[in-house]
A protein has these predicted regions:
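Membrane-embedded alpha-helical bundles of polytopic integral membrane proteins
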Residues: 2-228
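Interfacial loop-to-transmembrane junctions
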Residues: 246-261
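A short local structural element in Rossmann-fold oxidoreductases
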Residues: 170, 240, 244
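Re-entrant/interfacial helical elements at transmembrane boundaries that shape
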Residues: 176-177, 243-246
Length: 261
């Protein structure tokens, strides 16, 4: 009986240590990558478009390995090609054509997978794989199109980035420290209501701080936008957890230390 109790205590201690280490990795990742991203965002232009495209390519790579159980060329080739064309079209000031290219790449991937299905597929990635190209395309087009505004583009990118990062870090930290009722246990066994509220508070504080420092006077409106963005960030996190559960994966990727994708 004593050995059983000791092993349970040891397991809980190891879990807490692992959670603390994960939080440290998240903070370190943000501290290292954050300034780099913001410097490139401040510079803008082709360099920032390239950074966004590289990030979107990473998103597509991890998504494809998750939903197709491999680096499926039927998804990656048309997906990477669509991102490349979107990059060029954004750079020559054709955002509508860039967006259209993402959907063309998604449709092409679906057609290729329908025409050449795997004989014994472990999974059927047609819908999930083609939607992943749209998902990655949004990850590229969102920040790239925001930054095109020469007057407020950098502030907009800074607002979104800091709101999202603060939401993620505060939700994780507050949830781990306070615990409490789970937000949606069927989807995620770790996310709590306390963490969700903490994430919203942190996200709104970060977003309004950016606006205040940038001389924006409509702070109430900015706070509402930051609140909505924080909620959407956490909803996206829950969606990712649902996808991971759907495909039996613990993490969706490992490109950024401390983040499961």
């Amino acid at each position: 009986m004593s050995n059983h109790r000791d092993s349970g205590v040891t397991g809980k201690f190891a879990s807490k240590v692992g959670s603390a280490n994960n939080l440290v990795l998240r903070i370190v990742s943000a501290a290292v990558l954050g300034p780099l991203v913001l410097v490139v965002a401040y510079m803008g232009g082709w360099l920032f478009f390239l950074l966004c495209a590289a990030g979107a390519a990473g998103v597509l790579w991890e998504w494809t390995k998750l939903v197709a159980d491999s680096a499926d060329a039927r998804i990656l080739v048309p997906g990477f090609a669509a991102l490349l064309f979107a990059l060029v079209l954004t750079g020559v000031d054709e955002p509508e054509a860039a967006a259209a290219m993402i959907f063309i790449g998604s449709a092409l991937a679906a057609g290729v997978m329908a025409a050449w299905p795997r004989r014994f597929p472990a999974r059927n990635p047609l819908v999930w794989g083609s939607c992943g190209i749209v998902y990655a395309g949004i990850a590229y087009l969102g920040p790239a199109l925001l930054r095109r505004d020469t007057a407020w583009g950098f502030v907009a990118v800074l607002f979104v980035a800091l709101t999202v990062w603060a939401t993620d870090i505060f939700a994780y930290a507050v949830g781990r420290v306070l615990g409490g009722p789970l937000l949606w246990p069927r989807v995620s066994p770790n996310k709590t209501w306390a963490g969700a509220v903490g994430g919203v508070v942190g996200g709104v504080a970060a977003g309004t701080s950016v606006a205040y420092a940038s001389g924006v006077d409509k702070l109430v409106a900015v706070g509402v936008v930051a609140l909505l963005l924080s909620v959407l960030t956490q909803a996206g996190d829950l969606f990712e957890s649902a996808v991971k559960r759907r495909f039996g994966a613990k993490d969706a990727g490992s490109l950024i230390p401390g983040h499961g994708g």
